[in-house]
Amino acid sequence: MKLLLLLALLVGAVSTRHLNVDTSSLQSLQGEESLAQDGETAEGATREAASGVLMPLREEVKEEMEGGSGSEDDPEEEEEEKEMESSSELDMGPEDVQCPKEEDIVKFEGSPGCKICRYVVLSVPKTFKQAQSVCQRCFRGNLASIHSYNINLQVQRSSRILNVAQVWIGGQLRGKGHHKHFHWVDGTLWNFWYWAAGQPWRGNNSGRCVTLCARGGHWRRSHCGVRRAFSCSY
């Protein structure tokens, strides 16, 4: 009798052990399946991010570097563009243009064989249009177009010599919406740019004219009616 009871207890213990092992195996398999599904979901999310977020970001950076199209129009910019289009190219008569004194300017030469070989930086503050008038009437040129890092550096250094924070250069924003683009007022090719971080489209950037900063030499957008020092090329 005791032997039969002992055998029954042993059989029950073995059955319980097998049941625990099967349960653990089932939980392990379920866990692996869950991890596999999570991995597929993460991979799918990565692919979605790559196609839906990273590509537009690259396009935005490309547009930013090239001075390409911004999509939203600032009402102040539109008003500024209308004002510039409605008025004459030169907003000062000959009697209003006073050519600068020698102590107010720094001159330097461009590269040998260049199309635009002479540059001048002037410390007398003018609006963008007034500065363009001075460049045309006093130097028979235009606000400076910059086509290389070397010229950009020379304008920056000249600005520091005159102790001015920013100078107008000849870059100007034209167009609306996705057709916005920058151009040089002298009509030369827009083939070089040196925008500051976040310029010209990101953040709270506005204004249709371009300034060069004496600190760092980077470019920023600015409202054309602000009076600043400026640089001419001729």
Curated annotation (Swiss-Prot):
GO molecular function: carbohydrate binding
Keyword annotations from UniProtKB, A to Z: Antibiotic, Antimicrobial, Disulfide bond, Glycoprotein, Immunity, Lectin, Nitration, Proteoglycan, Signal
UniProt domain C-type lectin: residue ranges: 133-234
CDD domains per the UniProt record, alphabetical: CLECT_EMBP_like
GO BP: defense response to bacterium; immune response
Propeptide segment residues: 16-115
Span of the signal peptide: 1-15
PTM summary: Nitrated.
Disulfide partners: C135-C232, C209-C224
Glycosylation sites: S69
Region of interest: Disordered: 26-96
Main subcellular location: cytoplasm
Subcellular location: Cytoplasmic granule
Listed Acidic residues bias regions: 71-94
Record Pfam families: Lectin_C (PF00059)
PANTHER family xref list: MANNOSE, PHOSPHOLIPASE, LECTIN RECEPTOR RELATED
Protein's job: MBP may play some important roles in the allergic reactions and inflammations, since MBP is capable of releasing histamine from mast cells and damaging the epithelial cells of bronchial tubes. Antiparasitic and antibiotic.
Name of the featured protein: Eosinophil granule major basic protein 2
Source organism (scientific name): Cavia porcellus
Organism phylogeny: Eukaryota, Metazoa, Chordata, Craniata, Vertebrata
